[in-house]
Amino acid sequence: MNETTDYGASNTGANEESLRMVSSQPIGNEPASDEELRPHVLGGFIGQPRLKAQLQLFLDAARKRDVPPDHILLAGPPGLGKTTLAMIVANELEVPIRVTSGPAVQHAGDLASILSSLDTGEVLFIDEIHRLPRAAEELLYIAMEDFRVDVMVGKGPGASSIPLTLPRFTVIGATTREGMLPSPLRARFGFTAHLDFYPHDELQKLIERSANVLGVNLGDGSARELALRSRGTPRIANRLLRRVRDWAIVHDLIEVRSDDVKEALALYQIDSEGLDRLDIAVLDAIVRNFNGGPVGLNNLAAMVGEESETVETVCEPYLVREGFLIRTPKGRVATEKAWRHLGITPRDDVSKPF
């Protein structure tokens, strides 16, 4: 499988989320370092069993018909393996893959240039496809359905459009915000796959595989401790595994025990539930300063010294999903689970996690 990457302007800059150890967004050179951990065939991809079965059937049918498969949309939270699956599809089909992203395509002409250079059967992977400019989206509609692009020749009133026929290819789009895709674009995808957060047992298997690739000797219970702290996200699991590997190297450990995992990740202020310093600060402020809530977002953000957007988009989704926090019309409320996690006896009227 040949891979061509054109990310261009896809770097959105450092922010609070990208600096956290438990961020589901890539940090630093992680996209490159993740390459050694990526499986190359669908059978080696751990987790998402229903999706894998659907995708295997989809690819097998395309191979038997001897035609490029329909376009594929991979939707789900960041860090779950959308890029890896795109690479696997191209590898299974034994065709090259061209890689770009929504932010990298600044003009429709950028996308037209990529499309016009594709060969028959080639895969075009567009990460963050929901961030394509509107003009590029409209060009992509036609290319995906009719396999042609209209090239503008000349300028001003004398300009004319010349249709350029394209070879049959497959677009794989990845998005963390499927709802932001316009309906005409969604309709062009013949197969849509939704990736879910990983349960602890599947994440544990993934960590054991990654540890074997990285040469980390995990003792009994160590992979489980890592899985518990990884927020159901393979990208986070692999990142934490690397930090534990650093710990093992520095301390000359032959085997990494579960206590070593706890001690190593405590250094980064990551607790047994995968909560970090900022998560704990948010819960602590609600419980101690606002008696469990409700508290408005702006007041809460001011109390922890962060922007309101950071609290709302970086901290709250995981806290709500894991039952530590409830959003109400009156504000944020800490659940009984949050109180007990902080080691504080909850009030009698405190909400239980849903």
From Swiss-Prot:
Which Enzyme Commission number(s) are on file for it? 3.6.4.-
Where is the segment annotated Small ATPAse domain (RuvB-S)?
Answer: 199-269
Entry keywords, A to Z = ATP-binding, Cytoplasm, DNA damage, DNA recombination, DNA repair, DNA-binding, Hydrolase, Nucleotide-binding
One Pfam family this sequence matches:
AAA_lid_4
Residues involved in Mg(2+) binding: 83
Q: Is Transcription regulation included in the keywords of this UniProt record? A: no
Question: Which Gene Ontology BP terms does the record give?
Answer: DNA recombination; DNA repair
Region Head domain (RuvB-H), annotated ranges:
272-354
The organism's superkingdom is given as Bacteria
Amino-acid positions noted as binding ATP in the UniProt annotation, renumbered to this chain? 37-38, 79, 82-84, 145-147, 188, 198, 235
* Intracellular or extracellular location(s): Cytoplasm
| Catalytic activity from the UniProt record | ATP + H2O = ADP + phosphate + H(+)
Where is the stretch described as Disordered?
1-35
- Where does this protein chiefly localize? cytoplasm
- Disulfide bridge partners, by residue number: none
Q: Which annotated residues bind DNA?
A: 327, 332
Instruction: List the GO cellular component terms.
Output: cytoplasm; Holliday junction resolvase complex
Q: GO molecular function of the protein, one example?
A: ATP binding
Q: What is known of its domains?
A: Has 3 domains, the large (RuvB-L) and small ATPase (RuvB-S) domains and the C-terminal head (RuvB-H) domain. The head domain binds DNA, while the ATPase domains jointly bind ATP, ADP or are empty depending on the state of the subunit in the translocation cycle. During a single DNA translocation step the structure of each domain remains the same, but their relative positions change.
Subunit description? Homohexamer. Forms an RuvA(8)-RuvB(12)-Holliday junction (HJ) complex. HJ DNA is sandwiched between 2 RuvA tetramers; dsDNA enters through RuvA and exits via RuvB. An RuvB hexamer assembles on each DNA strand where it exits the tetramer. Each RuvB hexamer is contacted by two RuvA subunits (via domain III) on 2 adjacent RuvB subunits; this complex drives branch migration. In the full resolvosome a probable DNA-RuvA(4)-RuvB(12)-RuvC(2) complex forms which resolves the HJ.
What's this protein's function? The RuvA-RuvB-RuvC complex processes Holliday junction (HJ) DNA during genetic recombination and DNA repair, while the RuvA-RuvB complex plays an important role in the rescue of blocked DNA replication forks via replication fork reversal (RFR). RuvA specifically binds to HJ cruciform DNA, conferring on it an open structure. The RuvB hexamer acts as an ATP-dependent pump, pulling dsDNA into and through the RuvAB complex. RuvB forms 2 homohexamers on either side of HJ DNA bound by 1 or 2 RuvA tetramers; 4 subunits per hexamer contact DNA at a time.
Stored NCBIfam families: PRK00080.1, ruvB
Check the record and name the PANTHER family matching this protein.
Answer: HOLLIDAY JUNCTION BRANCH MIGRATION COMPLEX SUBUNIT RUVB, PTHR42848
The family classification in the record reads: Belongs to the RuvB family.
This protein is called what? Holliday junction branch migration complex subunit RuvB
Q: Which gene encodes it?
A: ruvB
